[in-house]
Structures are given as C-alpha cells and as structure tokens.
Amino acid sequence: MEGLKVTPLRGVYEEYGGKIVDFAGYELPTQFKGFLHEHHTVREKAGLFDVSHMGEATVKGKDAQKFVQYLMTNDINVLKDNEVLYTFMCNEDGGVIDDLLVYKFAEDEFFLVINASNKDKDVKWILDHKGDFDVEIVDVSDSIAQLAFQGPLAEEILQKIVDVDLQEIKFFKLKRDVLVNGKKCLVSRTGYTGEDGFEIYCKPEDAKGLWHAILNAGKEEGAQPIGLGARDTLRFEASLLLYGNEMDETITPLEVGMGFFVKLKVEEDFIGKDALIKQKAEGVTRKLVGFELLDKGIPRHGYEVIKDGKVIGHVTTGYKSPTLNKAIGLALVEEQYSKIGTEFNIKVRKKELKAVAIDKRFYTKKTKTK
C-alpha cells in the first residue's frame, strides 16, 4: 500500500493471517482469524492489539501541570503521580479537538496519548497554545510502540513474563520500567474494550519480540492477535466513544453524555470552559442515545434517524452486537427524542426500519477498580 505509514509490528501481521487495510494513514490489520472470533476471544480469554499508530507527546517543565490543565476539561489537579486520567481537549466553542489519556509521571512531567487520526492536529494545537507557560512539548510518537493486551485472562497471562506483581497496577494506574520479557516498558491498566487489560509502551525495536512473547505466554489459554474490526465492536459494546463518529469539533462532551469528564467547577480556566458552562446552563439541544433496531437490518454510521417524517439526527456507530446478538447503535438526536423508550426509525438502504431508544451502556464488565 504505497504512501502509507507502518508500525514496528508491520512484519508480523501476515505470520498470523492478518488482512491489511488503510487506517489513519497506516497499514494495519483489520482482522486475523475473523473479527467475530476475535471479538469473543477478548470477551472470554485475551487478545493482543497493535496500537502503535496512536500518538504520544510529553509535556515537561515548571508549568507542566498548569498547562495540561489549561488544555483539558477534566481536573488534572486530582491526578497523583503514576495515575492516568481520561479527558477531552476542546476548542473555544466546546467542540472536541480530541479525547485522550493523560499520564502523570510527576508534577513537571506528563505523557499524553492521542488518537492516530488527530496526531498532527493535536500536536499543533498544543504547541499553538503554549503561550508563556514554562513547558517543553515533544511529539514522541515515532520513538514509542504500543501494544494492548485485553481480556479476562490478560493479567494471568502477562504475569508470566513480567517482573512485578500486576495486581499492584490498579485500574487507571501505571508503572514505569516494568520488565516485560526482559525489556523495559511502561505498563498501565487501561484499555478500549470494556474488559480488564493493559497497555504496554515500549521501544519500537522491542515490539516484535514482545508481541511473540505475549502470544506464546498465552498459547494454552487461547490468546490471539486482534484486528481493528473487533477493536471497534468491542469499544462500541462498552459504549466507549470513537473520535470522528461520536465526537468531533462541532460536538461537545455534554452532548454525548460525557459531562463527568468536564469539571466546570475547577478554579483554573481551560479552553472551552465558558462555552461549556453556557451550554450546561441552557441545556443541550441534542443528545447521544443508544438504540435497538426492531426490524431486520444493520444500522451504520451516518444513517438518518427519522421521527414522523422528519430527520432528527444520525447514527454515529451501529453493528449487530456479537455479544448481545442484537442490531444496536448509537445516535446523536434532537434532545426531545432522547428519552429511553422513544420510538423512531432508522433509514437503512432507503427503507425506514423501526427502532427504540435504550440505555447506551450496552455491555459492562467489572474491571479492577481498586
């Protein structure tokens, strides 16, 4: 695939039967043994993902914490060293520039993990807003590879090849300099699947060895490599949002039900705070809802949502859920039609199919929160 970037793991995909696609300008595997098989593997056992296409940046310096707080909607000040926080980075109108993870190493050192499709945009945004803050910002994406190992057996398997007790790494916590198969890595108990699991950051030259070591460690338990197809169905079932689908620069966190990650009472200003305060006071005019298709069909991103002949919104993500075996979706609709139990239609291939609004938390599984 000419002109596309590759990750340090590009050479291993075919060994495992990977089918390669263009994703965010990278050659990445959409599936290995089939996305349904891979989806169930992560729900029931453990699966390994190459997520080295994600972006990473460091923010260091005397004003690092103040600067990161200025960029983010969540309360960075509550973070302790070696903790991770999910947050939004918004524009002045409250629209989402990106959703990302903030890793705190120390008060003067933070590590940001950003979406692959937004890497260049995010780094430019961060640099453009540096102002007089005493910080150094470095895009370190090309010097880091990232693997995600997710599923109920992930801890048990990974424990075989690490030098620390993984139970000490609690949910949304991190540990640096963990030896994974003898290689120094940053390991956090985070993920994008709705299952327990870990994200592992390593040197690019160590990625292939770690990939093979993790899969070999989990051979008896049935660990498998997982492609982008299952990654999307897994995150969707867990109602984890995808940039470009559920959010973009014209959609605010409040509209998609993510107000918990917007701390309007923090003393410090952050970009978009005034707009979000105003929106909260006035009330949102549209909301993200879950829905189940009652007629036979599969909803897809961009399909119209219709009520009494009027377009009231659009589908942001839709699938036949592998876990629930139902055609379900997320849709951004006018606020008055967002109540659970509201009936509307989804336009699927020129036909209007019946649907009903349901709780968008389609699937929940306990992760290790303590």
Curated annotation (Swiss-Prot):
GO terms for molecular function: aminomethyltransferase activity; transaminase activity. The keyword Transport does not apply. GO terms for biological process: glycine decarboxylation via glycine cleavage system. Its EC number is 2.1.2.10. It catalyses: N(6)-[(R)-S(8)-aminomethyldihydrolipoyl]-L-lysyl-[protein] + (6S)-5,6,7,8-tetrahydrofolate = N(6)-[(R)-dihydrolipoyl]-L-lysyl-[protein] + (6R)-5,10-methylene-5,6,7,8-tetrahydrofolate + NH4(+). The keyword Transferase applies. It is an enzyme of class 2 (transferase). It holds the Pfam family GCV_T. One of its GO terms (cellular component) is glycine cleavage complex. It comes from the Bacteria. InterPro entries: GCS_T, GCS_T_bac, GCST_C, GCV_T_N, GcvT/YgfZ/DmdA, GcvT/YgfZ_C, TrmE/GcvT_dom1. Belongs to the GcvT family. The glycine cleavage system catalyzes the degradation of glycine. The glycine cleavage system is composed of four proteins: P, T, L and H. This is Aminomethyltransferase. The lineage of its organism: Bacteria, Bacillati, Bacillota, Clostridia, Eubacteriales. The gene is gcvT.
